[in-house]
Amino acid sequence: MANNRRDRDKGDGSQGEGLSAGGGMPSEPEIVSVTVHPTPTLAVSLKPAQQGDIWASLLESSPWSANHGGRIEPVQPSPAPTRPTESPSVGDLVSRWSQPIWRTPSRVEEVETPESNFVIELEASQPITSDITVSVSDLVIEVQPIQTTEAEPEPELPVAEPEPGVVPVDVVAEAEPEPELPVAEPEPGVVPVDVVAEAEPEPELPVAEPEPEVVPVDVVAEAEPEPELPVAEPEPEVVPVDVVAEAEPEPELPVAEPEPEVVPVDVVAEAEPEPELPVAAPEPEVLPVEVVAEAEPEPELPVAAPEPEVLPVEVVAEAEPEPELPVAAPEPEVVPVDVVAEAEPEPELPVAEPELVHEAAVSEPVAESIEDAVAVPAPATNFGLAELMQAAAAMAPVLASPPSVAPAAKPVREPAKKRKAPPVRKKVATVQDVPVEDLLGGIFGIAGSAVRSVLSLGAGVVGGVVKGGRVIGDNVVAGARRLTGSAEGSCGTCSTSQCDTVGKKK
């Protein structure tokens, strides 16, 4: 019995292969039903047998016994073809001899194992009693593998594929999330049978299985600093607060800018009258103008005398009275001249008519005909010297022609030359850009001159009144004396004229 169990445990190394291939997990037993049919030629010995002899005979004739009494071998599935022996690589050796903690059982390897455990159930057509002796060699064993429902978890095989068993120990710790490395799965079938003795620490494997699950905990710990990054993000939000603080002095800069703008305000106030007369002039030049204006208290004096004094002072000051020139009376004098110039072509018409020479008058002296024909118009009273000069110039070519040159055959009429009227010179008011200072100085000068003229007129009136008062007073005194003289007595030879002269002398 003990030998049979030992041999059954050893088998052909299938269990050891299963342990080595499955990472220490025993393969599930495959149930096989065996029906035993005793042959009709089976001799049944009626010899009483002692209790236990039937079991001894069965064990001795069984193919699993030590003496191999029976020759009948059970029908077993053909073993899988053995792979050619290859020199194991370093990765295979590491995956084989590494600690079982990094290896998980693979159901694929369990399915690929050529051999598995069998549980034989004997069914006899006749009840076997202690009186019946059955020989195993006379039995016909029919092996019918039965697929139980426990063998159906094959679809769960892909779930157990993430096996990092091929990767070395150091690399597996980093490559744990790589479940796509089932390349070295068929290799565990080459493991020798001696590994079975080393499979004793296999019960520790299920305990160590949850350890790889602890590795993701480290990954979670690494993911914990990620929420710390957004915690540092609000810190730059405080930076805009500093920027706002820096932006506060910015309005102060524009406050300093308008300060230089206040200086042009005075210029703008001065520039308001500039649209009227935009010419700029230096301010210090106005001062001598005022001095010159004060030097003109005598408008009645000849103007030529003070002019040379004003010229060296300032030429611009002299240009100020120019606007007063158009106000003078010479302008209406120019108007009639233009009207007379338009009437000039009228006397020229009779001058061109005497040029016609008739045949009947050829024998007459040409000079007389010319003198008779040329009718010199009487100068108009409105003609000026310039108009008379132009009329004389028009008559000069007619008088200069010799008398013998006149044609004798046919009269030749020359086209009358129309002289163009002299262009009417229209006096265009010159617009000058006068600076504000000069304008103000001129205004003040005009006002001062007007005041001075008023004062002079007032002085003249006062003087006249005084003089008239004196004359009137003298006349009154003379009259009073005459009256007093007539009242006292006649003057005799004294006449009134003498009294008047006496009064005047007094």
Swiss-Prot record:
It is found in: Magnetosome. Induction: Part of the probable 18 gene mamAB operon. The keyword Repeat applies. The keyword Zinc does not apply. Acidic repeat 8. repeats lie at residues 342-355. GO terms for cellular component: magnetosome. Keywords: Biomineralization, Magnetosome, Repeat. GO terms for biological process: magnetosome assembly. Disulfide bonds: none annotated. Residues 1-12 have a biased composition (Basic and acidic residues). Its main location: other. Forms homooligomers. Interacts with MamK. Belongs to the magnetosome MamJ protein family. Regulates the dynamic behavior of MamK filaments; paralog LimJ also promotes MamK turnover. At least one other protein besides MamJ and LimJ is required for MamK turnover. May connect magnetosomes to MamK filaments. Moves from the cell poles towards midcell; movement does not depend on the treadmilling ability of MamK, suggesting MamJ associates and disassociates continuously from the MamK filament. This is Magnetosome-associated protein MamJ. The lineage of its organism: Bacteria, Pseudomonadati, Pseudomonadota, Alphaproteobacteria, Rhodospirillales.
